[in-house]
From Swiss-Prot:
NCBIfam families: PRK05325.1-2, PRK05325.1-3
Gly residues composition bias: residue spans: 92-101
Highest taxon above the source species: Bacteria
Basic and acidic residues bias (residue ranges): 77-90
Protein name (database record): UPF0229 protein Spro_2732
Similarity section: Belongs to the UPF0229 family.
InterPro entries: UPF0229
UniProt source species: Serratia proteamaculans (strain 568)
Length: 422
């Protein structure tokens, strides 16, 4: 009776290896599709999975095929419409007049895009790939955890690129030795017995013939053991290990004044949700301080920061003063890596903008590793932007970007937090 043993280790996800290889091969197309998809999501739906579409032409394997032109002879079965020697007109290519989404095509050519679903973890990994907190340094107390990829022995499952030839051959040798040990022992005994019988008198031809047949059968069984089996294959294994690093705090400052309409606030919320997901996904121990401001600034929790309806006038310096107070009370710059991200529409009381410049230049920027300012507006820049432009020219740890449309959010986010090369 034959027994089939399933040695696959993926359980229900038996195509996981092929899926991972597919994600690596078409990473650029997938990341482009994700960048387009994130702008269509609601504020509360940024971290779920996503249906990704890739043009079919990008994933087709190269192949030789017959061209559309030329003359070819074919034999088709007859029916009640055609008889022998009838000439059949060449059909037009299909696809343009189908029922799929999009505009109709006049040339009859077309093909649907390839659509597949990626999980939440795959989505977030691709979303935040190659991003990191800038200028992160190791301070005295190490609590923040970064994850880095390390070799972690070998695994019985993987992609061909990671196969370990030496370890696989070692397993093959061990398996063949174990499976044939008894047969080789019996073979040596029979060979010794045959040798003794050939050297003794009288000659026993029938007994010698029997021994030779048994020896031939044993050798055949030993040779039938495969040289390499899927059970022998071993792949280099890699895993993400937590590595202690410096502790960090991120200040999120958001303008909620009356000049910020709902669309502008939603774009600011999208940016901060991306930032929060990035921090919580990449680092294990990061403090996040939420500050909302109009004429007055207030430290709030996550729920109130994103969903409170409170509004008022605009004095940006109130948020900067509150941030400075919180730093002095709870976050010693000698022990903490301090980061800040400020979002506003740029509308500020004119006399307050120089004060913002002074607070940043003299108090905050000397303490922070990185300060990013995002102005969300379609109007011309005002005094606050011009004051901050002067800071950007003088301070390397200050960055500013302009967001006009929801499509700008993700590119701006990647520009502000791209991983810096050493």
């Amino acid at each position: 009776m034959a027994y089939f043993i399933d040695r696959r280790l993926n359980g229900k996800n038996k195509s996981m290896v092929n899926r991972q290889r597919f994600l690596r091969r078409y990473k650029s197309q997938i990341k482009q599709s994700i960048a387009e998809a994130i702008n269509k999501r609601s504020v509360t739906d940024v971290d779920s999975g996503e249906s990704v579409s890739i043009p079919t032409g990008d994933i087709n394997e190269p192949m030789f095929h017959q061209g559309r032109g030329g003359t070819r002879h074919r034999v088709h079965p007859g029916n009640d419409h055609f008889v022998q020697n009838d000439r059949v007109e060449r059909p037009q290519g299909g696809g343009g007049g189908g029922s799929g989404q999009g505009n109709a095509s006049q040339d009859g050519e077309g093909e649907d895009e390839f659509v597949f679903q990626i999980s939440k973890d795959e989505y977030l990994d691709l979303l935040f790939e190659d991003l990191a907190l800038p200028n992160l340094k190791k301070n005295q107390y190490k609590q923040l955890t970064e994850y880095k990829t390390h070799r972690a022995g070998y695994t019985a499952n993987g992609v061909p690129a990671n196969i370990s030839v030496v370890r696989s051959l070692q397993n093959s040798l061990a398996r063949r030795t174990a499976m044939t040990a008894g047969k080789r022992r019996a073979l040596h005994e029979l060979e010794d017995e045959l040798t003794q019988m050939e050297n003794t008198e009288p000659v026993q031809l029938l007994e010698e013939e029997r021994l030779r047949k048994e020896i031939a059968e044993l050798r055949k069984k030993i040779e039938s053991v495969p040289f390499i089996d899927t059970f022998d294959l071993r792949y280099k294994n890699y895993e993400r290990r937590p590595e202690p690093s410096s502790q960090a705090v991120m200040f999120c400052l958001m303008d909620v004044s009356g000049s910020m309409d709902q669309a502008t606030k939603d774009m600011a919320k999208r940016f901060y949700i991306l930032l929060y997901l990035f921090l919580s996904r990449t680092y294990k121990n990061v403090d996040v301080v939420y500050i909302r401001h109009h004429t007055q600034a207030k430290e709030v929790d996550e729920q109130e920061f994103f969903y409170s309806q409170e509004t008022g006038g605009t004095i940006v310096s109130s948020a900067l003063k509150l941030m400075n107070e919180v730093v002095e009370e709870r976050y010693d710059p000698a022990q903490w890596n301090i980061y800040a991200a400020q979002a506003s529409d740029g509308d500020n009381w004119a006399d307050d903008s120089p004060l913002c410049h002074e607070l940043l230049a003299k108090k905050l920027l000397p303490m922070v590793r990185y300060y990013s300012y995002i102005e969300i507006t379609r109007r011309a820049h005002q005094t606050l932007w011009r004051e901050y432009e002067d800071l950007q020219a003088k301070c390397e740890n200050f960055a500013m970007q302009h967001i006009r449309e929801p499509d700008d959010i993700y590119p701006v986010f990647r520009e502000l937090f791209h991983k810096q090369t050493a």
